Amino acid sequence: MLGIIDYGMGNLHSVSKALERLSWSYIVSEQPEELQKADGLILPGVGSFHDAMSILNETGLTAFIKDWVDEGKPLLGICLGMQLLFEESEENKRTKGLSLLPGRVIRFPGVATDGSTYKVPHMGWNQLTFRKPNHPLLTDVEEGHVYFVHSYVVKTDADDVLLATSHYYETVPAVVGRGNILGTQFHPEKSSNVGMSILRNYGAMVEKGVKARG
């Protein structure tokens, strides 16, 4: 069973509907004792990094998520939820993240290297380029287009966490992962067959982990 973390800033309806289409059982809760019943967690998110971390800290969900990951259980961050996995964001000068993956989150500058300006946010369909096509999250997934909506982008020197990238005037980390910590910058639940395949694979990884733990 999957658990969707409800902290007031997630695209809960669309994620829930996607899991229903895949016939995965799930719960939606903000209570750690309820979420503890799940086998894998999804951290959705839309909006401000600063506001999201404030809520997670105030509700005790930050500590719960870190303990969950330390126990080796799977976590998938979506959109803002992926960005929260990293160390910090420059939003509101500096906001500390969950620090589960190395890197920081900065705003798209809106100015290309040739001096031309471009639109922020990065919004719409864009092509994936796989860095680690054999990763279980990308098994049998088409290297196709997915749906992005974001004004901030992850910067990391840790190439090992980049499972797939996209390009919007610069390299955009699109799928990240290290061990049981995974994330997508785009919305898989809004990304047609490619996105649904990734969600299906995440569910399969969770299921496999349950069997491995006995």
Curated annotation (Swiss-Prot):
Gene Ontology cellular component list: cytoplasm
A single BP term in Gene Ontology: L-histidine biosynthetic process
Subcellular location, principal: cytoplasm
Chain segments annotated as transmembrane: none
Annotated ranges, domain Glutamine amidotransferase type-1: 1-212
SUPFAM superfamilies in UniProt: Class I glutamine amidotransferase-like
E.C. number: 4.3.2.10, 3.5.1.2
InterPro entries in the record: Class_I_gatase-like, GATASE, Imidazole-glycPsynth_HisH
One MF term in the entry's GO annotations: imidazoleglycerol-phosphate synthase activity
Localisation: Cytoplasm
Pathway(s) of this molecule: Amino-acid biosynthesis; L-histidine biosynthesis; L-histidine from 5-phospho-alpha-D-ribose 1-diphosphate: step 5/9
Substrates-to-products reaction catalysed: 5-[(5-phospho-1-deoxy-D-ribulos-1-ylimino)methylamino]-1-(5-phospho-beta-D-ribosyl)imidazole-4-carboxamide + L-glutamine = D-erythro-1-(imidazol-4-yl)glycerol 3-phosphate + 5-amino-1-(5-phospho-beta-D-ribosyl)imidazole-4-carboxamide + L-glutamate + H(+); L-glutamine + H2O = L-glutamate + NH4(+)
Pfam families assigned to the protein according to its UniProt record, in alphabetical order: GATase
Active-site residue list: 79, 187, 189
Keywords, sorted A to Z: Amino-acid biosynthesis, Cytoplasm, Glutamine amidotransferase, Histidine biosynthesis, Hydrolase, Lyase
Subunit (UniProt): Heterodimer of HisH and HisF.
UniProt function note: IGPS catalyzes the conversion of PRFAR and glutamine to IGP, AICAR and glutamate. The HisH subunit catalyzes the hydrolysis of glutamine to glutamate and ammonia as part of the synthesis of IGP and AICAR. The resulting ammonia molecule is channeled to the active site of HisF.
Protein name: Imidazole glycerol phosphate synthase subunit HisH
Organism: Halalkalibacterium halodurans (strain ATCC BAA-125 / DSM 18197 / FERM 7344 / JCM 9153 / C-125) (Bacillus halodurans)
